[in-house]
Amino acid sequence: MSFEEKVESLHPAIFEQLSSEFEQQIEVIDCENITIDTSHITAALSIQAFVTTMIIVATQLVIADEDLADAVASEILILDSSQIKKRTIIKIINSRNIKITLSADEIITFVQILLQVLNSILSELDVL
């Protein structure tokens, strides 16, 4: 499988997993003119999935043994599985002209950690 094919198959799967772990429940009752913006969260999760994919692929490029590469990537990404699962519940009752923007601060902070890990891996590979 080529580098591009690995990225194309891994990224959507990781994004789907991250999205499913991020719970959002918004109820709107008897309201009008409501805007709900979750694009920050979607973009942040997509970036997190991409960086995670790059860490996995970089590990597989360095370690020829696929099973060992997967084990090392899993060990590196132990933080990824221990990420705080976010649950957002918003209820709006009898209100008007409401705008809700859900932020992605926690996700972005975690992405910064993953980027530092990726930077370290690429530095060790003399790519940077």
Swiss-Prot record:
Pfam families listed in its UniProt record: Coat_X (PF07552)
Keyword annotations: Sporulation
GO cellular component, one term: spore wall
GO terms (BP aspect): sporulation resulting in formation of a cellular spore
Protein name: Spore coat protein V
